[in-house]
Amino acid sequence: WAFSLATDYNPNCRILSMPFIGNLATTRLGLDPLAALVAATRNPSTTLDDPDVTGTIVERGRADINILWSESVDGWCQTPGENPVITTIIAGSIVNVNE
């Protein structure tokens, strides 16, 4: 069963931080950091109902990728106050580099 993690930004819940949501999922719900990352990235892409467009890394794929700063998968959600993304690639082109 694939499930998704997301923020629910609204007037009563002003959270925009996916690392914070991942941190809650791992520390409060006991999810493995990799499972939380999949629930925040791959699983939501399945709702687009087009596996050829996004959500997978495959030859001749679209190549929308965020590259994270940590050497371990745990890093993306264990520092919820920091941006874990160092590079963003959309359609194979680098569009953002955080230093």
Task: Cite the ranges covered by each PLM segment.
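His/Asp/Glu-enriched, well-ordered alpha-helical/loop segment
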Residues: 1-68
